[in-house]
From Swiss-Prot:
UniProtKB keywords: DNA damage, DNA repair
Region (Disordered) location: 437-459
Positions with biased composition (Polar residues): 438-459
Family statement drawn from the similarity comment of this UniProt entry: Belongs to the DNA mismatch repair MutL/HexB family.
Protein name, entry field: DNA mismatch repair protein MutL
Function: This protein is involved in the repair of mismatches in DNA. It is required for dam-dependent methyl-directed DNA mismatch repair. May act as a 'molecular matchmaker', a protein that promotes the formation of a stable complex between two or more DNA-binding proteins in an ATP-dependent manner without itself being part of a final effector complex.
DNA repair found in the keyword field: yes
One GO term of the biological process aspect: mismatch repair
Chloroplast listed as a keyword: no
InterPro entries attached to this UniProt entry: DNA_mismatch_repair_CS, DNA_mismatch_repair_MutL, DNA_mismatch_S5_2-like, HATPase_C_sf, MutL/Mlh/PMS, MutL/Mlh/Pms-like, MutL_C, MutL_C_dimsub
Length: 668
């Protein structure tokens, strides 16, 4: 007897659901796309428990004829294509007829629908792929579909779902992309009784960007437009000063469909050229319209990847369009905004706090400000960040000589020093900071004074005693030992010194946090807010306290004392970018990345000319480092040429036919 047999429809649908429905966000995507294809202008999404127990999508679209409803839950039944020619001319978001039967196979589904052509609608109930009931129903035109108990008959799938906040952020992210694409549709999203997203449906894409990413970010967007014989491009791109740590903030829409395509996103980055910092990516929304014959959507179960004909031509059009648009714009950052914009935001926050109470207990801090704590705080002095009260004074620096006493001061509340190196720049910023004074190793009389270093007093085994010689091009230092010559990258060297200092500071979980009298606000999208809420323990472990301030804004209440003054917002943005990009970061990994980031930010740069004393101090600190050989990113700090190797380079040692001979034996 043969062993091959045809699978039942129920089992086949459950298998298909494994490809189409990965998580609650997949259900929301399929149902909302059906509503869009039905011509809806208003779509409301309601979820509970991140969609695991309840999802409801309500639209005012065309509805489904009652006769067609049972067929709609049959595999490969669709109204969107009829023959193979339609498969190459797809203009709808859905076309396979897999979504509804896949959802019904693994959940309890109830659908109520009505069209304008029928006097009554239909209320249809199906669970686990089996029809429960079909009864007449009255109501307005459109469709209401409710999904309960997702994966109830495939419990193994539930084990692979992430935390509720993570799953909810994925749902919101999908709706964000659809809202950016279909700006003429009014979307609302609510979860567990709280509103997460609301768009007006007025067709203004920049207004949707403001609703998702914040008004400040939307104001830093540039409109773009370009076309050739095959493609038409419109949309918005961010100014080079507005970047993120991943490509996730770049939305590419092809004929209204959100897609992921490396060649297209890479073309956007190429359009910026050298205007972007390494490892940073622009924000933006790119609308690409083309003949459906030039794209193949039927290559991915979730239809998130497509094949593009004439991809090279499209990429070049994107590069040219973006490059030309940036060339038209004055890209010099607004100095007033840079110096005073954040303080204005802080003042606005302070004024607003009197009338606004955050309504998001899902990100409540452990030591929330109740009435008792507020009263207690009001009677105690609060440390205020110097950056909020002390103006930056730019003064001309005196010419430094190597025989003067150089005193460097940098204050830290933990009273541990961090090395600071004088440069020969024309000006330097003098700001009042929290602590430590130490003298250079060369005093006025030339005597060797005692230094206090933030590193171990023991030199690493094998690290030579270096005698500083000079500097080249403000980037490299020359030094020598008894038998070798060394070339040192000054930026990498100070990165290593700073890294070991910050690693120690960040690794200490203490009460040395800076509580802000006037909190700093940062705009995030709703999906980012949800993801950040999921990682509050990691943030709190570093001494960073964030609280919600509305649907798309976070307040920095406290931050570690090692934050650089004036860079608090940028630092917090980078730290939250790590969490959003990497997802699963342990506290130890988080601290490691923070130490690396701060070490790079505080390191001297190329083309900065060090005084002899400062260079010697840098080498002294490097010699005390636990690992003086590599910067935190793995790049080499120094390279060595032995005396023998140098003699070979200059032919002072040559190989004869019989033996090595030295020019020292034959003086010129």
């Amino acid at each position: 007897m043969g062993k091959i047999h045809e699978l039942s429809n129920l089992l086949a649908n459950q298998i298909a659901a494994g490809e189409v429905i990965e998580r609650p966000a997949s259900v929301v995507k399929e149902l909302v796309e059906n509503a869009i294809d039905a011509g809806a202008t208003q779509i409301d999404i309601v979820v509970e428990n991140a969609g695991e127990t309840f999802i409801r999508v309500v639209d005012n679209g065309a509805g489904i004829d009652p006769v067609d409803v049972p067929l709609a839950f049959t595999r490969h039944a669709t109204s969107k294509i009829t023959d193979r020619h339609d498969l190459f001319n797809i203009v709808s978001l859905g076309f396979r007829g897999e979504a509804l039967p896949s959802i019904a196979a693994i959940a309890d589904v109830e659908l109520r629908t009505k069209t304008t052509e029928t006097t009554t609608g239909l209320n249809y109930h199906i669970k686990g792929g089996k029809e429960i009931s079909a009864t007449p129903a009255n109501g307005r035109r459109g469709t209401v579909i409710t999904v309960r108990d997702l994966f109830y008959n495939t419990p193994a799938r539930l084990k692979y779902l992430k935390k509720h906040q993570t799953e909810l952020s994925k749902i919101v992210d999908i709706i964000n992309r659809l809202a950016l694409s279909y700006t003429g549709i009014a979307f609302t999203v609510s979860a567990d009784g709280r509103s997460l997203l609301r768009t007006t449906g007025n067709g203004n894409q920049q207004q949707v960007i403001a609703g998702i990413y914040g008004r400040d970010n939307a104001q830093k967007m540039l409109a773009i437009a370009g076309e050739n014989d095959d493609f038409n491009i419109t949309g918005f791109i961010s100014l080079p000063e507005l970047t993120r740590g991943s490509r996730e903030y770049l939305t590419v829409l092809v004929n209204g469909r959100y897609i992921k395509n490396f060649a297209v996103s890479n073309a956007v980055i190429r359009g910026y050229g050298s205007k972007l910092m390494v490892g940073r990516f622009p924000m933006g929304v790119i609308n690409i319209n083309t003949n459906p014959l030039l794209i193949d959507v039927n290559v991915h179960p979730q239809k998130s990847e497509i094949r593009l004909s004439k991809e090279t031509e499209l990429a070049e059009l994107l590069v040219t369009t973006i490059k030309n648009r940036l060339a038209e714009e004055n890209l010099i950052p607004d100095a007033y905004e840079t110096l005073y914009g954040q303080q204005n935001k802080q003042q606005n926050t302070q004024n607003t706090q009197n009338t606004f109470t955050p309504k998001a207990p899902w990100i409540a801090a452990e030591d929330s400000m109740d009435g008792h704590n507020a009263e207690k705080m009001s009677s105690q002095p609060i440390r205020r960040s110097p950056s909020l009260v002390t103006p930056v004074e730019i003064t001309k620096r005196e010419e430094l000589s190597s025989d003067r006493v150089l005193t460097f001061t940098q204050k830290y509340t933990n009273e541990l020093p961090q090395p600071v190196f004088e440069t020969d720049n024309v000006v330097e910023q003098q700001v009042t900071e929290p602590t430590v004074t130490y003298q250079s190793q060369y005093s006025e009389t030339g005597s060797h004074s005692q230094e206090t270093l933030p590193l171990s007093e023991q030199k690493p085994t094998g690290f030579p005693a270096l005698d500083y010689i000079g500097q080249m091009h403000g980037t490299f230092l020359f030094a020598q030992s008894e038998d070798s010559f060394f070339l040192i990258d000054q930026h990498a060297a100070q990165e290593r010194v700073n890294y070991e200092f910050y690693r120690e500071q960040i690794g200490q979980v203490t009460n040395d946090q800076q509580r802000l009298l006037v909190p700093i606000t940062i705009d995030y999208s709703v999906s980012e807010m949800l993801a950040i809420a999921d990682h509050q323990p990691e943030l709190m472990a570093l001494g960073l306290r964030l609280e919600p301030f509305g649907a798309t804004t976070m307040i920095i209440r406290e931050h570690p004392t090692w934050f650089e003054k004036g860079q608090e917002e940028e630092t917090v943005r980078e730290m939250t970018d790590w969490l959003l990009r990497d997802g699963q970061l342990t506290v130890a990994q988080f601290r490691e990345k923070a130490a690396i980031m701060m070490s790079c930010k505080r390191a001297i740069r190329a083309n900065m000319h060090l005084s002899d004393t400062a260079a010697r101090q840098l080498l002294a600190h490097l010699s005390m480092a636990e690992n003086p050989y590599n910067c935190p990113h793995g790049r080499p700090v120094l390279t060595q040429f032995t005396l023998t190797e140098m003699e070979k380079m200059f032919k002072r040692i040559q190989e004869s036919h019989e033996k090595w001979e030295s020019y020292d034996n034959h003086p010129f």
